[in-house]
Swiss-Prot record:
This is Envelope protein US9 homolog. The chain crosses the membrane at residues 194-214. Phosphorylated on serines within the acidic cluster. Phosphorylation determines whether endocytosed viral US9 traffics to the trans-Golgi network or recycles to the cell membrane. It comes from Equine herpesvirus 1 (strain Kentucky A) (EHV-1). GO terms for biological process: intracellular transport of virus. The modification Phosphoserine is found at residues 163, 165.
Amino acid sequence: MEKAEAAAVVIPLSVSNPSYRGSGMSDQEVSEEQSAGDAWVSAAMAAAEAVAAAATSTGIDNTNDYTYTAASENGDPGFTLGDNTYGPNGAASGCPSPPSPEVVGLEMVVVSSLAPEIAAAVPADTISASAAAPATRVDDGNAPLLGPGQAQDYDSESGCYYSESDNETASMFIRRVGRRQARRHRRRRVALTVAGVILVVVLCAISGIVGAFLARVFP
């Protein structure tokens, strides 16, 4: 059985968009190009109708072969696909209907009934071992996730902070980091204050000793 096919033709931009105007084109050239485009569209429509007539006469019944028609049965442009016409407001008679709620519910019941068999197929020790295994991260240059007991031993001076819980939100994380930095700055200020006081005391002691020595040497 012969198959009627229409040759693919590239539509010029001026035809697909009548308001398009090339650079340096006059009004007369634009009108001439639009007239040529209208003639091209008419010729294309005539060729499409001829192909559709040829396909009907040869008895093509393949629903995958479609030809463009000017208007569907309801007056809107669409595609003729076999004996079914698809338009913006039309529906094909051969389209399958959506599944009914009863069928969807039956599928859910079937899936739920397989749950015990799936649980029985997986050994219980495997499930318990996977649940008890600590969370680790592949060593790709990033620090591993630390547990609650290991977080205290982590070097906080490195400036890296990790969430200690999967349930920690961003605001909680920011507040925790802020409190940690505030404690660090407070300890630093206290250490600097103590060091300054000690330095002053040492300088006073040295100056007193030097003064006593000079008073004894030069009475």
